[in-house]
Amino acid sequence: VKSAVENYRVYLTQLQTYFAQKKDLNAKFIDENGCEKTYAEAILDSFNSVRFLTALRASALGVEELNREIALALRAEKLLWFRQEDDWYIGKPIMITENDHNVKLYNGDIGLCLAKGKVWFGNREVSTSRIPAHEPAFMMTIHKSQGSEFEHTVMVLPTEPNPVLSRELVFTGVTRAKNQLSVFANEKIWQSAVRNTVKRQSGLGKLLQEKEE
């Protein structure tokens, strides 16, 4: 949770700075890499540069509990302001959990609430009243992260053995990281997971060894 607070402090501080400067979130600018983007996209890029992944949904280190704890910790640091955790509050990240072709939002899409009643998906602004089923996205399951890559991936494994932990699941989590991987796990659980092979995966052992080094 502490690691999440420090990493998410970046995009939330950026958001507060833009508000203080009264930036139009849909206005475009040229970033330090010479790329044209909107201020909303810049905040989303900051949020998406790091992703926290966990193996389970329901446990002390599952996605549901960690999403709750991270939100409360960010509020304690005065980086977020909300009364109830399920409120729409500025800075809240969400992940769509069902397809809605009318709104053109699909399972796995990530958005940020950056203004009252409005969520941005890239440079697209959608009213909160039109958002389909969703959940907080401070933390997501390794399974849900398939197909995505992040500059920095933080992977959290449970403290007790669980049938869902497998070599393939670890492989999925490890390969989400483009440049940096952090793992929160005790050695016994890690070794148990990488030995639990569901199906053969060519080159997996070598990749895991390289990542550990």
Question: Where are the model-predicted features located?
Answer:
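Conserved helicase motor core of P-loop NTPases
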Residues: 1-94, 100-102
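Aromatic-residue detector
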Residues: 11, 15-19, 46, 68-69, ...
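C-terminal accessory regions
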Residues: 107-213
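Contiguous effector/interaction surfaces
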Residues: 92-99, 123-129
